[in-house]
């Protein structure tokens, strides 16, 4: 399994792309969130990922920096069906609010022949806590993260019989979400900022976004082996990795 970060920033970053990534195996890809616009196409190109090789997309919630890029993915993949006689169905997963928003946006901004692909070639799958599916030959179980601002969904991907990758969206981990995080080999978590800046700004209280210190302590508490922190500020990208690493220890 390979993880490719396509973007690491929060909603209004200008020096990097919004947080989204692919999970890949055998040159097939699972796209998790899509960022806020057609910048997703450049990020995929720069990462040598062909849209035609994306087998499924998951949108965690309806905020612009996660869902707007989905329209561009649908536009590009839809063309594969319309022009190139592409055969493989494309599955999109999300909670009821996310799937409804995707459908409404596509109806508003894409030609009808793209919208005609829904339910036949492009499959919209509504998921909630306990729903399971198989992507890249791996079992995935979805769960509601009990977000404060808007309905948001996370998932566990089982890497083998005993190891899992857990994605918990872009809000602070709730008490009810901890059971999904516990004993993860990999955790993907929101970490808005680090160090003194985080202490002074207090993103947990203001925006329900985590800090590096909060996530590091969470990992220690729940026996998480590895963590990917994203959805961050872009004010000091050159030193961000160093600052975050130091604050996590």
Kindly give the residue locations of the regions a language model identified.
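Active-site neighborhood of phospho(di)ester-bond hydrolases with catalytic His/Asp-centered motifs
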Residues: 31-35, 54-65, 69, 95, ...
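Structured loop/turn residues at beta-strand edges in well-structured enzyme cores
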Residues: 49-52, 88, 120, 182, ...
């Amino acid at each position: 399994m390979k993880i490719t970060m396509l973007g690491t920033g929060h909603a209004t970053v200008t020096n990097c792309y919004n947080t989204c990534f692919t999970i890949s195996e055998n040159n097939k890809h699972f796209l998790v969130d899509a960022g806020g616009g057609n910048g997703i196409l450049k990020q995929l190109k720069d990462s040598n990922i062909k849209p035609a090789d994306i087998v499924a997309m998951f949108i965690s919630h309806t905020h612009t920096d996660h869902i707007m890029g989905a329209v561009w993915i649908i536009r590009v993949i839809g063309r594969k069906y319309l022009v190139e006689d592409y055969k493989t169905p494309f599955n999109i997963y999300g909670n009821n609010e996310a799937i409804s928003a995707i459908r409404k946006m596509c109806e508003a901004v894409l030609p009808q022949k793209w919208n005609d692909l829904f339910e036949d070639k492009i499959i919209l799958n509504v998921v909630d806590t306990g729903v399971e599916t198989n992507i890249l030959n791996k079992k995935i179980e979805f769960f509601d993260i009990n977000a404060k601002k808007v309905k948001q969904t996370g998932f566990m991907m089982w890497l083998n019989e005993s190891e899992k990758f857990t994605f918990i969206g872009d809000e602070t981990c709730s008490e009810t979400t901890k059971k999904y995080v516990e004993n993860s080999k990999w955790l993907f978590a929101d970490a808005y900022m680090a160090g003194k800046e985080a202490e002074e700004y207090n993103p947990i209280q203001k925006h329900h976004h985590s800090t590096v210190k909060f996530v590091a302590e969470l990992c220690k508490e729940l026996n998480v082996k590895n963590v990917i922190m994203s959805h961050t500020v872009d004010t000091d990208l050159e030193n961000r990795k160093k600052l975050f690493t130091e604050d996590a220890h």
